Design a protein with these regions (language model features):
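Conserved NTP-donor binding/palm subdomain of two-metal-ion nucleotidyltransferases/polymerases, i.e.
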Residues: 1-121, 127-385
Length: 385
């Protein structure tokens, strides 16, 4: 494991526990390499706080120190702007009696020890999908550009300089697996509300959803170190009062109990008591799990996603065969009708036009996604035969 990976874990632990890092660790840090790693996992702000506690910037090059501090300040500024904008959006929802619920990071960011410590890429809100058209009019009227209104499970809205909202019509879709899709199909039955409009999960149900969402990424393209930090912070803040019997039964029902337990225990070991050599105490399984998190970045990698899909196609646990690679390539070039259900509903409804979609995707890939396709092809080639 690289030294910067050990250092970022230690520094995050120091930031979370308000502990001053050891001078020997600070003196050995490559701030440029650490910055690249922190950015890859959307952890620059919390890592910067750890570095500031150790006075790491006192002797650092001016431009390097400036880069770190700007990253932290921008993360805080974005949350301030997004919070203010979110209040405008939710005030509108309340005025129109549109039921909604803040999701994921919107809840997590407020239980971290310091404001701005958890960086945010976007704000996620579940809403009553019957109000989609009304919300679309409101958001575009505020200067947002939107997409995804007929695909997937959320509508994405963007506005300069930093505004990014995902308004969810559902928490999971068919593409995320039948178990998760079915469990959350009637999510309104699990919601609590004081005014009948602004909703929330119980602490237990939020944790179950948070774990399910993390596992969705973990089991597909992967999820990064920030997920482990979320596990630690949430359990530190809420864990003692949660009904563990209920949690266990629901997590087992979803098939993610082992994932939750292993991630929770690993997170606690990494961050509860900051130690520079904490990784030396990990078991072989814990080390492998941590390496997967570290290798995934915030939102996973193409390599993880491709490898998982080819393993599913192979089906027998043996090394990936040439036949499997060919099947994978064909599935990417010529996706079937079921895949279109969430991604291109028109072609799901009218499959006779599928060839037009195939041609469009191929040309779009060649023009706009060459780098992505090259990475995917490289992963397919590297798979063991």
């Amino acid at each position: 494991m690289r030294s910067c990976e050990k250092q970022i874990i230690y520094l995050i632990g120091c930031a979370l526990n308000d502990t001053v890092p050891e001078a020997a660790v600070i003196d050995d840090i490559d701030l440029e390499a650490l910055f690249r790693l922190a950015n890859a996992h959307t952890l620059a702000a919390i890592t910067c706080i750890g570095l500031e506690k150790g006075r790491a910037f006192d002797s650092a090059p001016e431009d390097t120190a400036k880069k770190w501090k700007e990253a932290k300040d921008k993360a805080i500024r974005k949350i301030m702007l997004m919070d203010a904008e979110c209040r405008k959006i939710t005030e509108y929802m309340k005025s129109e009696h549109i039921r909604y619920m803040p999701l994921k990071g919107m809840v997590l960011k407020d239980i971290y020890p310091r404001y701005g410590m958890r960086q945010m890429a976007d704000y996620d809100i579940l809403y009553d999908s019957s109000a989609q058209s009304k919300l679309q009019t409101f958001m575009t009227g505020r200067g947002y550009q939107g997409k995804g209104f007929e695909t997937g499970v959320h509508d994405a809205y963007y506005k300069p300089p930093v505004y990014n909202f995902e308004l969810h019509r559902a928490l999971f879709g068919e593409s995320h697996g039948a178990v998760l899709d079915e469990y959350y199909k009637n999510v309104s039955e699990k919601l609590l509300s004081d005014d009948g409009v602004c909703c929330r999960f119980s602490d237990e149900d939020f944790y179950i959803y948070m774990t399910a969402h993390a596992y969705k990424h973990f089991s597909n393209s992967g999820t990064g170190l920030r997920t482990l930090v979320d596990f630690y912070v949430y359990n530190l803040k809420k864990g003692g009062a949660m009904n563990r019997e209920y949690l266990q039964s629901e997590l087992e029902l979803l098939g993610i109990a082992d994932y939750e337990r292993e991630s929770r225990l690993l997170a606690d070991k990494l961050f509860a008591v900051p130690k520079p050599d904490i990784l030396d105490s990990l078991t072989e399984d814990e080390t492998a799990l941590l390496e997967y998190y570290l290798g995934s970045g915030t939102y996973g990698t193409v390599s993880n996603r491709v490898s998982k899909k080819m393993t599913e196609i192979q089906g027998d646990g043996k090394p990936i065969s040439g036949r499997t690679k060919l099947k994978y390539i064909l599935s990417r070039l010529f996706p079937g009708r079921q895949w279109c259900k969430e991604n291109y509903p028109f072609f799901y409804k009218y499959p006779v036009f599928l060839p037009a979609l195939w041609i469009y995707r191929i040309f779009r890939g060649l023009v706009k996604r060459r780098k992505h396709i090259a990475g995917e092809i490289k992963t397919v080639k590297k798979a063991n035969i």
